[in-house]
Structures are given as structure tokens and as C-alpha cells.
Amino acid sequence: MNLHEYQGKKILAQHGVNIQRGVVLDNLNEIDKVSNKLIEETGTEWFVVKAQIHAGGRGKGGGVKLVKNQMELKEVVSSILGMNLVTPQTSKEGKLVRKVLIAEDVYYPGESETKEFYVSILLNRNTGKNMIMYSTEGGVDIESVAEKTPELISVSYTHLTLPTIYSV
């Protein structure tokens, strides 16, 4: 099963995890309404636009952009929606971006203690168990961490049944 980032965040939020707030769009029609709502609810001044495809490395391929104002937002969303995003995890043709997540910016200018973490929950096909992989290093460059300092990536297995999600 592949989940888009926004779907994973929704599951986490339903289970009490604080998440970066945002809205998913598949066109430009609601962009002003969405950005105004995010500003009102979060106080954010900047936005992060994230292509929603089933592949990692979206930022490296140009599918994640930091936007500093509402005027720039429409231009960036327009450039990402409909693009074929090529990442290290796609074919050379890339994947068509049909949806974007417009999220509050959680990195604030001037913050010196900004820290990225990596967490992934996946099924280990060899053991048939759910595996939680995490690191205090990485996020965007987790592949590099795995290659250069694999000891910084921890793995735990769980017998817990993860929530089942039904979609119509």
C-alpha cells in the first residue's frame, strides 16, 4: 500500500500526533481561500508546496518548494501541478503530479535549533512484521545517512496492528 504524504499525516493526526497543517489541492480554484485559511489558523507567513506522488526524493526533483508569500504561491502551485516529477525513485519519465499539499511553514527564519528527523513505518516483507525506521539525522537526505552512517538509523519491529483505513 502506498500513501501520499497528506494521507499519512491524516492518519497520524487521527491518533493524536501533532502534524504540519495543510490542505491538498488538485487545481488553482481554491488557492486564495486555502492560503487565507492557513494564515488565519496557523499564523504562518510562508508556505511549503509539496508534490503528492508515490516516490521519495521529491524535493531533490523540484517537487517541494518554500514559498514566501501568497502572490508567489499561485505561481509555484501552477508550476508543480501537472509536471512529470523525476526523482531518484521514479523512472526517467517521472510521475505526473495530480495533487499538491500546501502546508504551513514550520521552519522559521532565524531559528538556530531547527532539526529534521526521519520516521518511516513499513512492512518488512521478509519477516511479515511492521517495521519502524527512525533517525535523528536526515529527512531530506536519509539515503545519504544510510550510506555514510547507517548506525544513526534505528529499526524497531512491532507486532501491533496498524489502523485499517477504508476508502470509497
Residue ranges of predicted features:
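Catalytic core of tubulin tyrosine ligase-like
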Residues: 79-83
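A conserved helix-loop-beta module that forms one wall/lid of the active-site cleft
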Residues: 1-45
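Single conserved hydrophobic/aromatic residue that forms the stacking wall/gate
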Residues: 159-168
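Hydrophobic alpha-helical hairpins/lids featuring a short glycine-rich hinge
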Residues: 91-152
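Acidic, proline/serine/threonine- and glycine-rich low-complexity intrinsically disordered segments
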Residues: 154-156
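Glycine-rich phosphate-binding loop of ATP-grasp-fold ATP-dependent ligases
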Residues: 20-22, 49-76, 118, 141-142
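ATP-grasp fold ATP-binding core
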Residues: 5-8, 12, 42-59, 88-110, ...
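Structural motif
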Residues: 17, 23, 45-48, 63-64, ...
